[in-house]
Design a protein with these regions (language model features):
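Glycine-rich phosphate-binding loop and adjacent beta-alpha segment
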Residues: 110, 143-150
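NAD(P)H dinucleotide-binding glycine-rich loop of Rossmann-like/cofactor-binding domains
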Residues: 15-80
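Short, structured coil segments at secondary-structure junctions
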Residues: 35, 115-116, 135
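Mid-domain Rossmann-like dinucleotide-binding core that forms the NAD(H)/NADP(H) cofactor-binding site
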Residues: 54-125, 131
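Short glycine-/small-residue-rich Rossmann-like dinucleotide-binding loops
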Residues: 4, 125, 144-145
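N-terminal Rossmann-like NAD(P) cofactor-binding module of classical short-chain dehydrogenase/reductase
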Residues: 17, 121, 138-141
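A short acidic, Gly/Pro-enriched loop at the edge of an enzyme's catalytic core
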Residues: 131-138
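Glycine-rich beta-strand-centered segment in the early N-terminal region that forms part
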Residues: 1-23
Length: 150
């Protein structure tokens, strides 16, 4: 194993996870060459199981949001915004400059507000199908599925 000469933030032996589209060649190989921008260190004292538990929802959200080709200021409804995938999508969407409109249970409002969400609908007590269209949305990121968005 080796690290490219221009790469300054990784050393041989670092525990890492990486992003690579499933369609890319090499994700099942024992060794591959990958761009350092697609790699993140696994924090010390973090098991590979724990790292995978963070990486999978994060990368699922990242890949889905990238496919939108959304523009700064556009609005995305993230249904189930406080769940594993939903919270990662919420944070990434905000970093991308999107306005997040979230649905969540009331117990999750505070954590979503601290993350920067300004519009939250309680899907347990409010008819979000009536509330949200008034705000106008450009995209829907559904982490709940089933009958909920019909």
């Amino acid at each position: 194993m080796e690290v490219g000469s221009a790469v300054k933030n990784f050393d041989v032996g670092d525990q890492v996870f990486f992003y690579r589209k499933f369609s890319d060649i090499g994700t099942w190989a024992e060794e591959i060459t990958i761009n350092a921008l697609d790699v993140a260190k696994i924090p010390a004292n973090t098991s590979t199981e724990e790292a995978g538990g963070v990486a999978l929802p994060l990368l699922t959200s990242y890949d889905a949001l990238q496919q939108l080709n959304a523009k700064v200021g556009e609005k995305v409804l993230i249904h189930g915004a406080a769940g594993g995938v939903g919270f990662q999508a919420t944070q990434l969407a905000i970093k991308m400059g999107l306005e997040v409109i979230a649905t969540a249970g009331e117990r999750d409002f505070e954590v979503l507000q601290k993350a920067g969400v300004k519009s939250i609908t309680n899907y347990k007590t409010q008819d979000f199908a009536q509330e949200i269209p008034q705000q106008g949305i450009d995209y829907v990121f559904d982490t709940v599925g089933g009958e909920v968005l019909k």
